[in-house]
Amino acid sequence: IGCYAVTDRVVDEIWAFVAGALDNGQARIPVHAFPFRMTERNMRRRSGDKWAPFWDNLKTGHDLFAQEGVPPKVSVCEGRYVFEPGEASTVDSAVEERCPKEVAGRTPL
C-alpha cells in the first residue's frame, strides 16, 4: 500500500466519483495505478531497468483500457497479471487467480 500526493481540487474530484459510484450501488471502486505514463517512449527509456518485464506486463492492461475505455478484467497467473477486455457490468469484479492455457507454465516475472 502506498500513497499519491494530490491537490485538494483533485482529491475533491476523486471523492465525488467514489461517492457517486457508491450512492448508485457500485460495490467496488477499482483503482488501476501505473508507475509512470506508459507511452512507447517512456517504455523504451526504461527498457534496461530490472522492473522492465513487470512494466511490460502492466502495459498490456494499460493499453487495453486505452483501447476499450473500460477497465480490463484482471487475473493473476503464475506471478503475472493477465488482462482481458472488461465490460461495464464487470467494473466491480475482483482480481482472481486464473491461468489461461496461453499463460500457464511461463516463468513468473
Where are the predicted features?
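Exported/periplasmic cell-wall-interacting domains
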Residues: I1-G105
